[in-house]
């Protein structure tokens, strides 16, 4: 994929929000990026793998799952093209992938070095704010999910809460 085409695609990604394709192209030139292809149902990462790169789904979709010790699996969430993976875990003390990541369809993921990314966000306030917003939104989503599961014990309570929350949005 050409940098120009990738830059246009990345205008829709939260980390590059508000930047034009030309500015994104200049960023990409500094990032030493790689695009990897994955087949449907391929495991991209396992829970516990070290997270050393910024990762963005640029084509396709994937889901995160956790496996209990007894073998049961829980789907944590689906991610689609344009989403940044595990951004809130990238610079933490324990920067490991929090879930197994499995593709739902043939997919392409963009990888770039987190230290080089850090260099470019130091130089552009908008990029820094975009990253902070990305990890804040992920943290808020996680908090919301924990609260939802904490306050709604039964299936009935969870369904009613979901309906109430989504009814108010329409």
Model-assigned labels for residue ranges:
Residues 41, 52-65, 70, 81-82:
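Glycine- and acidic-residue-biased ligand/ion/polar-headgroup-sensing regions
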